Amino acid sequence: ISFSRGLRYIMQDMKEVQPTIFVTVPLMLEKFHARIVKKISAKTAGSAIFKFGKSASMVGRAFGSKSIGRKLFNEVIETFGGKLRLIVTGASALDPRVAEDFMTMGIDLYIGYGLTETSPIVMVNNDRLMLTDSVGTPLPNIEAKIHNPDDLGVGEIWVRGPMVMQGYYKNPEATAEVIT
């Protein structure tokens, strides 16, 4: 486990540490993505090569191979230390196009959902369900449902399981205010 010295040092620290797994928030991924796209677009025919590479990588992923993306986008992977194979993110929504681009580079991406009161993960996608526009399915022993969904399926997320907060430690008054 390693922690960066600060925002301005993240890329330098990643090259030094060479992580295989990177846990971050969507905003950081979007910033990295913008820099990657800008760098690729600055090259002659960079955008066309990027589109071709994405297409070839997606075909490879459909057949269970991530190596095509890793080879085609090796230069990008090297900026993250060269060994990055998995990014785990959550805490806010991630642009599905950003998720797709990282996945086509041969990097798996797990997007999760949770709350402080649920210690914190409730749902996450995984090897079998790696969607770019979803936080996946509930973890084992967790039940989740959309309460009173509207016509579009939008409603409040209700969660039940052993990881849900039982109350505030030694503070029954505060507990009574939030849990009925």
Model-based region annotation:
Residues 1-3, 25-29, 46-49, 112-114, ...:
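Glycine-rich loops and low-complexity Gly/Arg-rich segments
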Residues 1-17, 23:
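ATP-dependent adenylate-forming carboxylate-activation enzymes
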Residues 7-8, 26-27, 47, 53, ...:
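Alpha-helix N-cap/helix-start capping motif
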Residues 17-85:
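Alpha-helical "lid/cap" subdomains adjacent to substrate-binding clefts that gate access
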Residues 22, 61-64, 68-180:
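Conserved AMP-binding/adenylate-forming
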